[in-house]
Amino acid sequence: RLHNGIGKYVRIDGDNYVEVSQSLRQLISRLRLYNDDLENRIAIPELALASLDNEFDDAFASSNGDLLAIRDRITKSQIAEFVIPSTLNGELKNYQIDGYKWMMRTLSWSGGVCLADDMGLGKTIQTIAVMLQKRDDGPILVVAPTSVVLNWQSELVRFAPSLNTKILNQCAHKTKMIDEISFGDVLVASYGMMLTQIANLEKKEWGIIVLDEAHAIKNYNTKAFK
């Protein structure tokens, strides 16, 4: 009922009313911004939890364990120091360092990231820095338009020679390559190749999946999106 209206008094049944405190009304107003239009309840996406500040600590304290765990990861990520990997063969500009730290911070609490800098500002090297830092999380999959697959290979060789880069499009034994890929490996594939090998790719537990020109999957009716 609070979902539908948050006046000072809310009728719970018949002639019985309960007074809603100002702090609770403020909380509900904030939460309704993230509402998924579910009947009689408010849904909060994980990514929205980062914007709920300390004034709502009491609400988190009485919530379920999953919500508390997510909030704890977010809190820790805000104070964590994310250093540039020493294995990165290149120098990041200040704004690229900010982008790298933002990606690491968001990934540390299981959020996904969308890096939308203008062309030429170094999205690739920022992403490669993240790959180097997260290499111990598992093999890495990069999906890109066919026209830039080889560019990814050259950039990885240039900036991250310690990573083992493999091009799925060039391999004659694709199933074997996917099966054998492991920690420290980066598999680069075109969107078309991803679709033909999706059954094999889905079997693998990837540490990171990078989608270059991710607008390629914006249409939810396409096979690439699914």
Please describe what each predicted stretch is.
Residues 1-73:
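Charged, low-complexity intrinsically disordered regions
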Residues 60-226:
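ASCE P-loop NTPase motor core, strongest for the SF2 helicase catalytic module
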